C-alpha cells in the first residue's frame, strides 16, 4: 500500500518495516482469466498448490478428490482445461484455491468471462462454497448483482477510497453519497433546496424526506429508487396520508421489460422526470395523466457537495 498496514487478524502482512512473502501469507487468488495450465489435467492444476506447499502425495490425492466433489467436478480429474466449459474451468480455479485451505480468499472479477445465465449460476455456487468452507473472502466486482448476492458486507470504492461500507441492503436502501446511490442500483436524483426541517423543494415541487433538522435554504439532493414509487389513475385533489408525498404527472414513456414495466413520468409541479418501475401488465401509457405516490421514508437525503 502507499500508506498504512495490511493486517489479517493479528498478523501484519505489509507495513513500512515488514513484508511477508506471498507464499507465506496463507492466501489464495482466483483470477478473471482462470489462469489454468492447459498442459496439466484438472487434478494436476488443483494439486499445484499442495505440491508447492509440500503436502505428501498420498494426502494430496484425497484432498483433490474431496475438493472436486465439493465443486461438483467429481470424475473430471483426468480431463484438460480445453475440454471443459467456461463454468467448469471456473470451478477448477475455485477448487485449486480452496484445496490449500487459505486464511483469505481473493477473487478478481472471476465471473466476467461467463455468459449471463452461467454468471448467475456461479454467483450462487460461490456463495454456497463460502458458506460451506467459511473462508474470509475478498471479492472485487463491478457487477452490483454479484455484490448483492455474494457478500455479507460490501464496500464501494471510488478513486482508491472507501465511499461507503455496510451490508448490501444498507448500501441500496440508505446510500450516503450520490456516487453510491447511482452505483448500487437505479435511482432518481433530485437537486433541491431545503424549505423546512423535514422537506425540500424544487420549483413548485415539495417533498417530505427521510431526514429532520434541515436548514431552510441549504442545498440538498434526494435519492428515490424507481421501485418505491407507485403510479395510479389521476383523481381529484386528495390529502396525502401522513408521511407520504402525493404528486401528479404525465407518462412520457412506458417500456415493457418482461417481468416489469419501466416508466418515465414528468411531474407537473416541476421539471423533474422520474423513472418508475411497476408490475406488468402496464397500468398507464404514454400521455396518460397519473398520480405519483412515494413515502417520505423512501426519499433519502444525500450531501449536496458530493
Give the ranges of each region predicted by the language model:
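C-terminal boundary and immediately downstream tail of ABC-type ATPase nucleotide-binding domains
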Residues: 173-196, 223, 293-295
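ABC ATPase nucleotide-binding domains
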Residues: 22, 26-28, 32-179
Amino acid at each position: 500500500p502507499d500508506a498504512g498496514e495490511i493486517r489479517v487478524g493479528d498478523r501484519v502482512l505489509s507495513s513500512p518495516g515488514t513484508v511477508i512473502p506471498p507464499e507465506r501469507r496463507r492466501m489464495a487468488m482466483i483470477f478473471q482469466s482462470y489462469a489454468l495450465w492447459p498442459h496439466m489435467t484438472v487434478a494436476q492444476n488443483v494439486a499445484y498448490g499442495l505440491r508447492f506447499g509440500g503436502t505428501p502425495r498420498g494426502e494430496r490425492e484425497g484432498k483433490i478428490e474431496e475438493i472436486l466433489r465439493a465443486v461438483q467436478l467429481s470424475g473430471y480429474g483426468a480431463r484438460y482445461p480445453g475440454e471443459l466449459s467456461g463454468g467448469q474451468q471456473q470451478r477448477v480455479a475455485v477448487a485449486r484455491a480452496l484445496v490449500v485451505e487459505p486464511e483469505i480468499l481473493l477473487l478478481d472479477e472471476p465471473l466476467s468471462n461467463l455468459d449471463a445465465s452461467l454468471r448467475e449460476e456461479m454467483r450462487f455456487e460461490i456463495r454456497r462454497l463460502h458458506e460451506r468452507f467459511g473462508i474470509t473472502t475478498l471479492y472485487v466486482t463491478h457487477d452490483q448483482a454479484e455484490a448483492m448476492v455474494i457478500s455479507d458486507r460490501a464496500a464501494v470504492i471510488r478513486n482508491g477510497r472507501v465511499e461507503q461500507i455496510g451490508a448490501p441492503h444498507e448500501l441500496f436502501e440508505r446510500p450516503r453519497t450520490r456516487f453510491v446511490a447511482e452505483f448500487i442500483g437505479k435511482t432518481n436524483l433530485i437537486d433541491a433546496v431545503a424549505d423546512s426541517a423535514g422537506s425540500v423543494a424544487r420549483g413548485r415541487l415539495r417533498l417530505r424526506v427521510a431526514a429532520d433538522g434541515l436548514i431552510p435554504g441549504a442545498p440538498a439532493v434526494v435519492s428515490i429508487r424507481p421501485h418505491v414509487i407507485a403510479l395510479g389513475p389521476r383523481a381529484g385533489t386528495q390529502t396525502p396520508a401522513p408521511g407520504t408525498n402525493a404528486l401528479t404527472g404525465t407518462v412520457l414513456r412506458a417500456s415493457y421489460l418482461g417481468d416489469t414495466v419501466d416508466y418515465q413520468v414528468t411531474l407537473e409541479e416541476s421539471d423533474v422526470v422520474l423513472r418508475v418501475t411497476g408490475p406488468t401488465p402496464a397500468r398507464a401509457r404514454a400521455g396518460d395523466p397519473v398520480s405519483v405516490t412515494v413515502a417520505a421514508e423512501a426519499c433519502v437525503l444525500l450531501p449536496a457537495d458530493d
